């Protein structure tokens, strides 16, 4: 059995996840980051995107992180995020509508392009999470 470590994901609404796992893959600002037990200490930004957990029994679970910061230590990783969601919590129709709305706003001078791009990124992350169940 592979070695495990504690993963805590904390959102403004409270503790989203708190359990021992074998591995988690998150999206950092420079690409994907796989975290295992005994990882070198690191603090990094977390980009909007999906995350994938593998438990010691090899069961898998994925979800969505809407940005944040991760503090990684050999025995524990803590992710503070703006929001986290499990695929079953995502309304796919609403996410697709948000994607379409954001795409229109990116090309409209009346809207803040940066905010529209962030909304697009969130919508795509939600759609990807829901489709990868």
UniProtKB/Swiss-Prot annotation:
First-listed, main subcellular location of the protein, grouped into a coarse class: membrane
Membrane topology: Peripheral membrane protein
Domain of life from the UniProt record: Bacteria
Regulation of this protein's activity per its record: Inhibited by nitrate.
Role, per record: Produces ATP from ADP in the presence of a sodium gradient across the membrane.
Location(s), subcellular: Cell membrane
GO cellular component term of the entry, any: plasma membrane
Protein family per UniProt: Belongs to the ATPase epsilon chain family.
Name of the featured protein: ATP synthase epsilon chain, sodium ion specific
Highest classification ranks of the organism: Bacteria, Bacillati, Bacillota, Clostridia, Eubacteriales
InterPro entries registered for this protein in UniProt: ATP_F1_dsu/esu_C_sf, ATP_synth_F1_dsu/esu, ATP_synth_F1_dsu/esu_N, ATP_synth_F1_esu_C, ATPsynth_dsu/esu_N
Protein keywords: ATP synthesis, Cell membrane, CF(1), Ion transport, Membrane, Sodium, Sodium transport, Transport
Gene: atpC
Taxonomic source organism: Acetobacterium woodii (strain ATCC 29683 / DSM 1030 / JCM 2381 / KCTC 1655 / WB1)
GO biological process: sodium ion transport
PANTHER family: ATP SYNTHASE DELTA/EPSILON CHAIN, ATP SYNTHASE EPSILON CHAIN, CHLOROPLASTIC
One Pfam family, short name: ATP-synt_DE_N
GO MF annotation terms: ATP binding; proton-transporting ATP synthase activity, rotational mechanism
Keyword Cell membrane recorded: yes
Summary of subunit composition and partner proteins: F-type ATPases have 2 components, CF(1) - the catalytic core - and CF(0) - the membrane proton channel. CF(1) has five subunits: alpha(3), beta(3), gamma(1), delta(1), epsilon(1). CF(0) has three main subunits: a, b and c.
Keyword field contains Transmembrane: no
